[in-house]
Amino acid sequence: MTTTNLSAVADPLRLYDETFASRLLLGTARYPSPQSLEDAVRVSNPAMLTVALRRQSAGSPEGGAGFWKMLRELGVPVLPNTAGCYSADEAYTLAQMSRELFETDWIKLEVIGDDYTLQPDTLALPAAAERLIRDGFKVLPYCTEDLVLCRRLLDVGCQALMPWAAPIGTGRGPTNPYGLRLLRERLPNVPLIVDAGLGVPSHATQVMEWGYDAVLLNTAVAQAGDPVAMAQAFAMATQAGRLARLSGPMPERDVAQASTPVVGLPFWHAEEKQA
């Protein structure tokens, strides 16, 4: 089976009641130009494009009728988010506005609890998620790798989670590998998307090898020297990590083990080993 067939047909990403061919989600902010964003989307073929309603304005390159027209023409599903919200009420209101504007029930839920780390508010996040799910939203909550928080989000009705790898925009990669791997182990049947903190394609490959279902990127692509090439690199890295996971990596060993069999070697090699 080719990797193309694996991605598009045999191994789709399943979120709520929908399936997606790609396991990469892409943000739309901070690109050098609208053209670079458009080109990055075309080469990476993401499952969804995240859009922060609060950050858009008619006078910015990321806002206005031209921006929305470009998104529609790309034909990629839009995932609005509640970036910049600091309370459950604020996030709820912005989500309702996003639903009306984008005509979608999808929402990436962000409720920030700390300005310095942009860490999610672990109390307000489940409360906001519960309200939105009651209203029919398909909520993808931005959270940490905290297992208790993640279980609480599942309890209120979330069917997928988006734990961070590191604080937003840092590009540090997974700062708590143990916690992320444990979360994957304890929630084996829950779609998990690593959101925030990935900086280079190898980070995406790593978390996909751990069994994560998808990755979401923005700054790592938008602020790269060549955003289009980086978008393509991340798409390939994500697919490589997924294929490696499904292929069953060899177990790690503490001691060396020869990869070349000794059967059939000349007799004097056997004598040397016995000596």
Curated annotation (Swiss-Prot):
Domain of life: Bacteria
Major localization class: cytoplasm
Active site: 108
A UniProt-annotated Pfam family: ThiG
Binding site for 1-deoxy-D-xylulose 5-phosphate: 169, 196-197, 218-219
GO biological process terms held by the UniProt record: thiamine diphosphate biosynthetic process
Record InterPro entries: Aldolase_TIM, Thiazole_synthase_ThiG, ThiG
UniProt keywords, alphabetically: Cytoplasm, Schiff base, Thiamine biosynthesis, Transferase
EC number: 2.8.1.10
CDD domains per record: ThiG
GO CC terms of this entry: cytoplasm
Example GO molecular function: thiazole synthase activity
Disulfide bonds: none
TM stretches of this protein: none
Reaction it catalyzes: [ThiS sulfur-carrier protein]-C-terminal-Gly-aminoethanethioate + 2-iminoacetate + 1-deoxy-D-xylulose 5-phosphate = [ThiS sulfur-carrier protein]-C-terminal Gly-Gly + 2-[(2R,5Z)-2-carboxy-4-methylthiazol-5(2H)-ylidene]ethyl phosphate + 2 H2O + H(+)
Entry's localization field: Cytoplasm
Enzyme class: transferase
Pathway named in the protein's UniProt entry: Cofactor biosynthesis; thiamine diphosphate biosynthesis
HAMAP family: ThiG
Family the UniProt entry places it in: Belongs to the ThiG family.
Subunit structure: Homotetramer. Forms heterodimers with either ThiH or ThiS.
Function noted in UniProt: Catalyzes the rearrangement of 1-deoxy-D-xylulose 5-phosphate (DXP) to produce the thiazole phosphate moiety of thiamine. Sulfur is provided by the thiocarboxylate moiety of the carrier protein ThiS. In vitro, sulfur can be provided by H(2)S.
Name assigned to this protein: Thiazole synthase
Organism of this sequence: Ralstonia pickettii (strain 12J)
